[in-house]
Amino acid sequence: MSGVNNTSANDLSTTESNSNSVANAPSVKTEHNDSKNSLNLDATEPPIDLPQKPLSAYTTVAILCLMIAFGGFIFGWDTGTISGFVNLSDFIRRFGQKNDKGTYYLSKVRMGLIVSIFNIGCAIGGIVLSKVGDIYGRRIGLITVTAIYVVGILIQITSINKWYQYFIGRIISGLGVGGIAVLSPMLISEVAPKQIRGTLVQLYQLMCTMGIFLGYCTNYGTKNYHNATQWRVGLGLCFAWTTFMVSGMMFVPESPRYLIEVGKDEEAKRSLSKSNKVSVDDPALLAEYDTIKAGIELEKLAGNASWSELLSTKTKVFQRVLMGVMIQSLQQLTGDNYFFYYGTTIFKSVGLKDSFQTSIIIGVVNFFSSFIAVYTIERFGRRTCLLWGAASMLCCFAVFASVGVTKLWPQGSSHQDITSQGAGNCMIVFTMFFIFSFATTWAGGCYVIVSETFPLRVKSRGMAIATAANWMWGFLISFFTPFITGAINFYYGYVFLGCLVFAYFYVFFFVPETKGLTLEEVNTMWLEGVPAWKSASWVPPERRTADYDADAIDHDDRPIYKRFFSS
């Protein structure tokens, strides 16, 4: 569904054309038509292009962005290790309760709180701590939130037998990870060349899956110990990961948009030069610098950004916040955590009794599928990936839930004797298909879209609110899933199936394509009110030719059913 016009990734705005663009209009309604007309008249002067470079030329930039994306590894490591901690004997003995038989166990409530409270900390941290990146810069912000994460790990690793101490440590480490989840994709999106921006932001999700996988492997390697080594090794390694993260921040470039905002223009040019692999005096680089600076100066004229500005419909900020919240919420409601929770039960039906082996199998599929996503997000576009992902996951859930209800446990959860080995095998296959579909589309695609959507003045706030929605749904699903699955077993799958149907239609009608556009061009597209299903054919003002019909893109009077079946 991505159009050819939208993928001309090497075009840059000139200062002259930018002065006429909608991005510079305080009131979109009053200047929208005038800007379109003037832009078409001025189209005789072609924009300055950055030199076309092979992907190998961006190796250094990719490595630098990989260092920034390592924040995703920290989040993934926590996810991978905590899922195993709650099944380790020493952890249960220290932080669990005794039953009538004198054995220790973790109640569903206590286990749910220990695991899911992390998400609450992340939601708060994303909203509160992301502001550090606006004040002191993205790099300093990432170092700060990483330090807060370390404090939380210290509290957890020094816990002896008080579950609430571990609980508090989880909240504090969540604060740090919440800040990382906002600032890491934000910095990547602001330093990455637009030709490969989607791929580089996708590295954050790749590092998440790598952290989850290695966390699973660490738990598997320590499970045979009979003391605190079982879980303290996993926590102790966090100090190595955070040291690497902080060290890496010494080498990555600061966001050129932040540098321009605080008046460090020469540093901003050097940052752009480092990211785009051109000299600091290159005309195309200077043109992009002028475009960014003009947009920032315009935003400054409106005064300091406030939280209330997120409710503005005049500049389409509220619509973007709503879209970001919906996309991040729907990512959780795809049901990926449901599969991670139920995977052990299903795999047991074919003889895999070791839950740690089950986790590793799921982690392997999740991790290696993420490599494909690094390619597909830029090749096929954000919107297309989300649509295909929703459709394929929907099919997986339809088969998984139906086979579970009718063949595996036909008499319900009260009779859990496996009645069909073939049914169990079928469900495992579709579990893997689901994880593959999720990892290659929605897992990282949501972060890419959200990081590209908001104008600079409200970017940290908008991303924080959207990401907080993800964390809140993560808390609700991880806390209540054990209770829900105990009550309705595989019928729970139909709930997520319904959510995926909604997700498909929501993406089609409300999520625009941003592939191949600069962040400033994305802002212009939103201001022009381009329908999402026609966004792949939208052309930035400075690249329009005389035969470009902006009205045909901005307005579509066809019936809904005809729009839906068009590209």
From Swiss-Prot:
Region: Disordered, residue numbers: 1-45
Cellular component terms per the entry's GO annotation: cell periphery; fungal-type vacuole; plasma membrane
Biased composition (Polar residues): 1-16
GO molecular function annotations of the record: carbohydrate:proton symporter activity; D-glucose transmembrane transporter activity; fructose transmembrane transporter activity; galactose transmembrane transporter activity; mannose transmembrane transporter activity
Residue ranges, compositional bias (Low complexity): 17-28
Compartment(s) of residence: Membrane
GO biological process: carbohydrate transport; hexose transmembrane transport
Pfam families: Sugar_tr
Residue positions with a glycan: 87, 227
Side of membrane Extracellular, spans: 78-112, 161-170, 219-232, 354-359, 406-429, 489
Predominant location: membrane
Cytoplasmic side: 1-56, 134-139, 192-197, 254-336, 378-384, 451-467, 511-567
PROSITE patterns: MFS, SUGAR_TRANSPORT_1, SUGAR_TRANSPORT_2
Gene3D superfamilies to which the protein is assigned, alphabetical: MFS general substrate transporter like domains
Sequence intervals crossing the membrane: 57-77, 113-133, 140-160, 171-191, 198-218, 233-253, 337-353, 360-377, 385-405, 430-450, 468-488, 490-510
Protein topology in the membrane: Multi-pass membrane protein
Keyword annotations of the record: Glycoprotein, Membrane, Repeat, Sugar transport, Transmembrane, Transmembrane helix, Transport
Family: Belongs to the major facilitator superfamily. Sugar transporter (TC 2.A.1.1) family.
Primary role: Probable glucose transporter.
Protein known as: Hexose transporter HXT9
Organism: Saccharomyces cerevisiae (strain ATCC 204508 / S288c)
Gene transcribed to yield this protein: HXT9
